[in-house]
Every structure is written in C-alpha cells, then in structure tokens.
Amino acid sequence: ILMHDSKLDRTTTGKGLVADHTLAEIKALQLRNGCHIKTIYKVPTLEEALLFAKGRVMLNLDKAFDYFDQVYTLLEKTGTTDMVIMKSDAPADYVKKNYGKYLKKVVFMPKINLDDKNAMQRLDDYLQIINPVAVEFKFASDLNRLPYDVKNAMKGRARIWYNTLWNTHAGGHDD
C-alpha cells in the first residue's frame, strides 16, 4: 500500500499499526484530509498510485529506501522508473554499494541534516561519489550558517531542496 506513517490513525479512518492489518482491512478504510476530516478516497496500493500518477507528476518516495528492491520491481512493472525520487540519509558510499544499480535509472536525492557536524563532508561525499541532481537539506535554526555554505558548494552542480512542511526542517520556517 501507499502509506507515509507506520500507523493508520493520522491519515485514515483506521487505528493501530499498518503492519497489524490485512490489505483488505486497509482497503476498506477512508483517507483523511489535512484537517483530519474523512474523505471519499481509499488507501491505494503503491502500484495503483504509480499507474495513476504515470505521465502526470514525479513522486517523492521518501519512505521507500529500505524497501527499494521491492519498490523497483513495481517501478519497472508500471513503467515509472523515471517518475520517482528515491531519498535517503544513508552515507554516499553505502548508497553506491547497495543501490548503485538503480542510480542511473531513478532520481536519487540524498538528505543531509545541516545541524550535523559532518554535514559538509557528507555533502562533498555525495557530490563526488553519486553526483545527485539535487540534495534535500534540513536545519533547525536560522543561526546555522551552513545553508549559505551549501549554496556556494553546490552552485552549478546540483539543485537544493529545502523541505518546508515543518518549521523544524527549515530554520524555523514552514509553508
């Protein structure tokens, strides 16, 4: 199924862990909107979502890294390998060693926490080892000066993605 959370409570009319329910039970639930209001929509399988999105949008599969071998099989089956973004905060050498076979077939976007003391080294590793088209950064406070350093380090090499869904990811700012 396509589910962001490990629990059903926030995004569906169900309760409890996703892993504790059958596919039939989950398919019977309804999705909730951002205000937690029940909608008419059902929980799709990943395959259904890929087919629906095919040719329309890119999909950010930010929770799929640990299952990417399985996910990739679906991407090939649905012809959507060029429509997804695979993300991870794993070290660049680990990504290259374990997922290198996918890096020319899908967009890979590393995630780097700029509050980490090794952030710039991690960025350099990614730029040297993987050469991503973009990098997602997060940082907790505007007092962090690394967003300025990142801009210079990445100029002409890769795009910058700041996730502004929560203020804890973008220096206290959100959408």
Predicted regions and their residues:
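An active-site metal/cofactor-coordinating segment within enzyme catalytic domains
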Residues: 1-55
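C-terminal active-site rim and adjoining tail of enzyme catalytic domains
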Residues: 117-175
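Active-site-adjacent beta->alpha loops and helix N-cap segments on the catalytic face
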Residues: 67-69, 90-97, 142-153
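Distinct, well-ordered alpha-helical segments
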Residues: 67-78, 92-103, 116-127
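Acidic, His- and aromatic-enriched active-site or binding-groove loops in soluble protein domains
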Residues: 13-16, 80-91
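Structural recognition of alpha->loop->beta junctions
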Residues: 78-86, 101-106, 125-134, 174-175
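Active-site beta-loop-alpha junctions enriched in small/polar residues
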Residues: 5-6, 29-31, 64-66, 89-91, ...
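Hydrophobic faces of well-ordered beta-strands that scaffold small-molecule active sites
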Residues: 59-61, 84-87, 104-111, 135-137, ...
